[in-house]
Structures are given as C-alpha cells and as structure tokens.
C-alpha cells in the first residue's frame, strides 16, 4: 500500500486510505486535480469511483489492488455502461445504494461511514452478488423505486 501511495507524489494523502470515510475516499476519486482522475473523463470517474469500489470490494480484492486498476483503461463493457451517464444522478444512485446497505435515510450520513466498515459490510452483505451485467439492472431498479417514493 505504501509503495502504491508513493507512486502518486502529486497527490499526497492527509491520512491513511482505510481510515477515511466513504465520502472522503469518493472526493479523492472525483478530485479534478488528482493524478488518477486527470486520466479520466467525468463519466468514467463516476463509473470507476463508485462502480469499481463496489466491484472490487464485492470480489474481496484488496483496496490497493482496486486503486491500481484506476490506471487501467476501461473495458468495452465498462465504456458502454458509463456512456451517457448523467454524473450527478449516477453519483446519487450509487450513494443511495450505499445507504441501502446501512439502512440509513440520508446520503450525508452514508458519506460519514468509515470506508473500512463500508468494505466489510459490502463483503458480508453482497459477497454472493458478484459484479455482473445484472448489477446495473439492479441499480436501475433501485433508482426507479426511489423516484416513485
């Protein structure tokens, strides 16, 4: 992990990644000035920062491995999934998904959840729901359900 962090000297971290909240980690992933995000367009950032966080924690890979994938190009499937995404609503949908894991009522509360706890809950709650083509359908259904309320 330390070796990986040192490979991004243009973005010094104020505290260890696993002591950050979900909100703080998301801010780093969406920061316009960070080394990682300069390589991505806004749609790709939204897709990777939230979608990949779910994907890699669900598959129980280490956070360092997840972060290293930020440097890789998107697969054709990922490009298709991120194409045409409205950034604010996509981010809101993913945060609402976070909220559902914790049975919370506000996104503000979800953003304060420690990232380490979030990853543990994801591992325990959705380990059987491997990231797949169906995952976007599940998110879309949740989004429609939320809009109806």
Predicted feature locations:
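An amphipathic, hydrophobic-aromatic interaction surface with interspersed Lys/Arg
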Residues: 1-144, 149
């Amino acid at each position: 992990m330390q070796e990986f962090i040192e490979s991004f000297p243009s973005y010094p971290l104020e505290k260890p990644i696993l002591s950050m909240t979900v909100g703080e980690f998301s801010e780093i992933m969406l920061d316009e000035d960070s080394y990682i995000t300069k390589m991505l367009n806004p749609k790709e950032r939204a897709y990777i920062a939230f979608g990949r966080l779910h994907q890699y924690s669900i598959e129980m890979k280490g956070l360092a491995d997840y972060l290293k994938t930020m440097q890789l190009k998107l697969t054709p499937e990922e490009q298709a999934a991120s194409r045409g995404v409205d950034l604010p609503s996509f981010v809101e949908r993913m945060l609402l998904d976070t909220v559902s894991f914790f049975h919370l009522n506000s996104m503000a509360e979800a953003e304060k959840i420690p990232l380490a706890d979030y990853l543990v809950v994801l591992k325990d709650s959705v380990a059987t729901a491997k990231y797949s083509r169906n995952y976007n359908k599940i998110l879309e259904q949740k989004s429609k359900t939320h809009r109806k309320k």
